[in-house]
């Protein structure tokens, strides 16, 4: 069963976030049947990012935190784009493209084209393959969502 829980922030932002999550689920993971996504709108800018995505206690649980002030400070488009970026990370984790390992120290692993996982823990943020992919995908997904949901 797919469970989506959105909390914090303004009611209109919670509604928009839930719509965006379901949109990405339908578009990128239509066959996924067991996923638990919890999105909290809270202050994250002070922590150095508009949003964060973490794996939960099991492989089907994801926690997203997004700054609750994005829509007011930068506009609705920025909030949607941030949600889409973090949902790309959910997709990466749910499909096995990215893994976090904790045994023997924390490691962030990425499945390369040859099918092997490689450790990118010490790679600069802007060069981490999951971030490169998420930044590349967030714009087109946001644009399509805005068009399909008549937010343009």
Regions found by a protein language model. Give the residues of each.
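Short catalytic/ligand-binding loop motif for oxyanion handling, primarily in non-cytosolic enzymes
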Residues: 47-49, 73-74, 91-92, 99-101
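Short pre-active-site segment immediately N-terminal to the catalytic Zn-binding motif
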Residues: 64-83
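Active-site recognition of the HExxH zinc-binding catalytic motif
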Residues: 81-94, 134
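Catalytic zinc-binding patch centered on the HExxH motif and its immediate surroundings
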Residues: 10-13, 40-63, 74-76
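Metalloprotease/metallohydrolase-associated module, dominated by Zn2+-dependent proteases
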Residues: 77, 97-152
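Acidic/histidine-rich, surface-exposed loop or edge segments in extracytoplasmic proteins
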Residues: 1-7
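Zn2+-dependent metallopeptidase catalytic core
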Residues: 12-35
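Short alpha-helical scaffold segments that flank and stabilize functional sites
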Residues: 20-23, 91, 137, 141
């Amino acid at each position: 069963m797919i469970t989506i829980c959105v909390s914090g922030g303004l009611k209109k932002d919670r509604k928009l976030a839930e719509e965006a999550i379901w949109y990405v689920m339908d578009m990128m993971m239509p066959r996924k049947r067991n996923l638990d996504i919890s999105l909290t709108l809270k202050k994250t800018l002070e922590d150095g990012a508009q949003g964060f995505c973490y794996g939960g206690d099991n492989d089907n649980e994801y926690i997203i935190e997004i700054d609750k002030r994005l829509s007011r400070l930068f506009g609705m488009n920025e909030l949607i784009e941030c949600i889409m970026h973090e949902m790309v990370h959910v997709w990466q984790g749910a499909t096995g493209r990215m893994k976090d390992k904790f045994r023997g120290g924390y490691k962030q692993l990425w499945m390369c084209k040859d099918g092997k996982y490689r450790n990118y823990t010490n790679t600069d943020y802007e060069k981490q393959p999951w971030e490169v992919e998420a930044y590349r995908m967030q714009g087109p997904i946001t644009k399509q969502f805005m068009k399909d949901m008549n937010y343009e």
